[in-house]
């Protein structure tokens, strides 16, 4: 497991360092007036807590501007799972009013219905939204689909032959639920907390699978392909996962640190381990992969045909054929 805190130099009592690294006298390379607690291998910086927090917030502002993620009057639905990344993103985006004073935020959480896991996450999301004074919309699988995730998993395990993983069902159903919930609250865009690590892992997985279409589509700001598909933005796409986590610790915000009981994507875990080993040996590898794919996307996109959508015959949402993918999966579950 790649340790998220391996670059923490020391603690002054505010941040617990699980590695128990000895205290050093290194000074912050930005302000020069406070002791550093974090070393950034890819930039060579040593940062104090204040400059670290400032660097994350400035980087997100730069990323938003770089990709033109927000319009001046956007209503942004922030996908909040209750985990470290989504909670960190929520707190960073509340500062957006400095640059986008007419924009507004609303938090959206999808309740998949996973007993012993989602209950805690919902409470944490609600707590953070309350502290930030944000509206919080919750949409559940049970309400939308008639099944909880626990029920879907139980039924899918009765299926004969090749079975989809719980993550395969959940990913499709969550994306649809998030889009529906965001439209309900009048959002114009959806912000997700995909970090640099998430993006690079997905890029490599798509390359290994030869999936050019997904490689092109999954941009920091997705294209507008249908009026009922809200565009998604990824303000954390250039923030390493360990820095998103450390931001939450330094800010002392509550988040869920227990992994989902169904999370077991073997392929993603293999890719994660590989890219983390490369990053440890060659600092900046993740940024290099990310920037390379970003440069390739425009050229690759020209080779793809434009998607045509029809209305799903079951739910009326946009679909590439008679049934949208979510309704296809639900139909399979109902037939078991």
Model feature map: region roles:
Residues 2-217, 238-251, 324:
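ATP-dependent adenylation/nucleotidyltransferase module used to activate substrates
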Residues 57, 65, 75, 189, ...:
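Flexible helical/loop "lid" subdomain adjacent to adenine-nucleotide binding pockets
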């Amino acid at each position: 497991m790649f340790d998220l805190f391996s670059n923490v130099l020391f603690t002054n009592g505010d941040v617990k360092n699980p590695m128990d690294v000895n205290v050093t006298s290194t000074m912050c390379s930005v302000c020069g007036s406070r002791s550093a607690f974090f070393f950034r291998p890819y930039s060579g910086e040593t940062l104090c807590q204040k400059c670290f927090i400032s660097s994350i917030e400035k980087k997100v502002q730069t990323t938003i501007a770089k990709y033109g993620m927000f319009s001046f009057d956007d209503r942004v639905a922030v996908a909040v799972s209750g985990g470290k990344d989504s909670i960190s993103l929520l707190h960073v985006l509340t500062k957006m009013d400095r640059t986008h004073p007419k924009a507004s935020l609303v938090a959206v959480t999808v309740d998949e219905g996973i007993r012993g896991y989602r209950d805690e996450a919902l409470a944490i999301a609600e707590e953070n939204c309350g502290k930030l004074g944000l509206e919080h919309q919750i949409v559940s699988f049970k309400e939308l689909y008639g099944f909880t995730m626990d029920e879907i998993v139980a039924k899918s395990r009765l299926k004969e032959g090749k079975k989809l993983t719980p993550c395969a069902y959940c990913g499709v159903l969550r994306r649809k639920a998030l889009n529906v919930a965001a439209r309900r609250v009048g959002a114009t865009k959806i912000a997700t907390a995909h970090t640099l690590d998430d993006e690079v892992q997905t890029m490599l997985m798509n390359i290994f699978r030869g999936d050019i279409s997904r490689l092109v589509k999954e941009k920091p700001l997705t294209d507008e392909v249908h009026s009922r598909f809200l565009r998604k933005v990824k303000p954390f796409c250039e923030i390493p996962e360990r820095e998103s986590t450390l931001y939450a610790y330094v800010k002392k915000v509550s988040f869920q640190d227990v992994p989902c009981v169904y999370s077991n994507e073997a392929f993603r875990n293999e890719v994660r381990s590989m890219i983390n080993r490369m990053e440890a040996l060659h600092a900046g590898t993740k940024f290099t992969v990310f920037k390379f794919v970003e440069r390739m996307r425009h050229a690759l996109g020209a080779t793809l045909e434009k998607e045509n959508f029809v209305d799903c015959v079951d739910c009326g949402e946009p679909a590439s054929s008679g049934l949208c993918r979510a309704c296809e999966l639900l139909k399979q579950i109902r037939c078991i």
